Amino acid sequence: MSRRGTAEEKTAKSDPIYRNRLVNMLVNRILKHGKKSLAYQIIYRAVKKIQQKTETNPLSVLRQAIRGVTPDIAVKARRVGGSTHQVPIEIGSTQGKALAIRWLLAASRKRPGRNMAFKLSSELMDAAKGSGDAIRKKEETHRMAEANRAFAHFR
């Protein structure tokens, strides 16, 4: 048995303007090459665009988008007896949110458009409505888990 203690789970900090942890998680995932101020700029411009287009609280649109994209179940490759099976596993809320944010950013990067703030705002609004690439990715993951339900006992 290891003598080393377990690491304490860090609490997610909130961003300076909206005091929201989801915004901070989004900023940390969009971050490239340590340019955090640029990441904040992109997020805040995207939030402003959402507010202009929907004329509602942009944070509620963000929450709704992330809630819509968050998967309940995913598949994990597990090697059993020489063959690899895709085993469906349940996902916790924190890991689900992290996956949702990753999928939203990947989908917005793929979009054609002017700049990242525009693409991110469009993807967030689409996800809040229940469409877009990120929602498609979630549905695809759920379909994979459903198709491989027979291997659930390998968990």
Curated annotation (Swiss-Prot):
GO terms for biological process: translation. Its main location: plastid. It comes from the Eukaryota. Coiled coil: none annotated. GO terms for molecular function: rRNA binding; structural constituent of ribosome. One of its GO terms (cellular component) is small ribosomal subunit. CDD domains: uS7_Chloroplast (cd14871). Gene3D superfamilies: Ribosomal protein S7 domain (1.10.455.10). It is found in: Plastid, Chloroplast. InterPro entries: Ribosomal_uS7, Ribosomal_uS7_bac/org-type, Ribosomal_uS7_CS, Ribosomal_uS7_dom, Ribosomal_uS7_dom_sf. Keywords: Chloroplast, Plastid, Ribonucleoprotein, Ribosomal protein, RNA-binding, rRNA-binding. One of the primary rRNA binding proteins, it binds directly to 16S rRNA where it nucleates assembly of the head domain of the 30S subunit. Part of the 30S ribosomal subunit. Belongs to the universal ribosomal protein uS7 family. This is Small ribosomal subunit protein uS7c.
